Amino acid sequence: MRATKAIIHLDNLQYNIKEIKKRLNKNVKICLPVKADAYGHGAVRVAVAAIRAGVSYLAVASIQEAVELREAGIVAPIISLSLPVLEEIPELLKYDIEPLVIDEEFINDLNRFAKKLNKKAWVHLKIDTGMRRIGCSPMEAVKLAVQIDRAENLELKGVCTHFAVSDSTDEKNIKFTKKQISVFKDSIKEIKKAGINPGLIHAANSGSVLQYPEAQFDMVRPGILVYGYAPSPSLNSLIDLKPVMELVTQVVLIKKIEKDTSVSYDRCWTAEKETFVATLPIGYADGLMRSLSGLKVRIGKDFFPIIGRICMDQCMIDIGASPWVQRWDEVCIFGPVSKEHPKNNTAQDLAKIAGTIPYELTCDINKRVPRIFIDETIQ
């Protein structure tokens, strides 16, 4: 097995689900997004652990992601959060995947395919309340709900929306989110007035789970919270979470270099004095962004900086003039904070350095990095 690996702490995942449940009203379900291979954590194993911890629904971004789960034996309901193309509809129906619907044309196409294949399609009507990505306008919601209700081979399983800035503490953004919630509630009222059961009503993402209890409705869709991070550092204090992914590698070579010796591409780092350099078999092709040069990584209880350019497959660290570090020592790039390692880097720390978000950090960990799953313990 490669020296570089992602350790997936499924016990932490289940801990996070328990913490989220504490914030939910009675009988509110959880739909866990496992798109992008569960944000890089491994969709199948994450889905199984999450279902054992009480997650009711799964969400994906593509039909292929849903098929992977079905073929692994997962029978829980799965929502596809992205719009499928016509060629994907037969597979969607075959594997009982619940798509979002947003317009008359797709509703008609889906009903036609379902009738031809003698299948029933369960759908979720997506209303655009402010994200401006996908969804029908609130003014069209009732008309489309009626169309679904009248379609012989369709059933309205739910109505949903998505919040654009629910993780923000800025007053303007709070006002915007509250407006989204209000528009969504009004749309649901109108659908009910038309005599149609909206099914599962769901809207809350991670930010709104923490800040807007009025947006819980029947089901919530927390993504990054389950994987151990608040969607914004400003919300860290609102919930106790444990990062699920730990990225580690090993020292594969140690060499002594003299003062004024340059390291790596472009010669952008030069030794100010005699020192030892350790090579690590991890680079930007594994998901360690080039912008993370300078990051201090942990060996034992000490931290050492990445020096020079991060290469495609390797990087180098300065371990000092009198190193105790040895070849094959384990190196932690990021992982959970613990009593043993209270100063561990987290994906949120790396995201701050790289000018991005933890989602991108974990999603970018390449498939060639093996995932090692620490079996969950349900308490």
UniProtKB/Swiss-Prot annotation:
Broad EC category: isomerase
Molecular function terms, GO-annotated: alanine racemase activity; pyridoxal phosphate binding
E.C. code: 5.1.1.1
Keyword Isomerase: yes
Listed GO CC annotations: cytosol
Keywords associated with the record: Isomerase, Pyridoxal phosphate
Single Gene Ontology BP annotation: D-alanine biosynthetic process
Domain of life: Bacteria
Reactions performed catalytically: L-alanine = D-alanine
Residues recorded with modification N6-(pyridoxal phosphate)lysine: 35
SMART domains in alphabetical order: Ala_racemase_C
Cofactor (UniProt): pyridoxal 5'-phosphate
Residues engaged in binding substrate: 133, 312
Functional pathway: Amino-acid biosynthesis; D-alanine biosynthesis; D-alanine from L-alanine: step 1/1
Cross-referenced InterPro entries: Ala_racemase (IPR000821), Ala_racemase/Decarboxylase_C (IPR009006), Ala_racemase_C (IPR011079), Ala_racemase_N (IPR001608), Ala_racemase_pyridoxalP-BS (IPR020622), PLP-binding_barrel (IPR029066)
CDD domains for the chain: PLPDE_III_AR
Active site, per annotation: 35, 265
Function: Catalyzes the interconversion of L-alanine and D-alanine. May also act on other amino acids.
Family as reported in the entry's similarity comment: Belongs to the alanine racemase family.
HAMAP family: Ala_racemase
The protein's name: Alanine racemase
Organism: Treponema denticola (strain ATCC 35405 / DSM 14222 / CIP 103919 / JCM 8153 / KCTC 15104)
Gene that this polypeptide is encoded by: alr
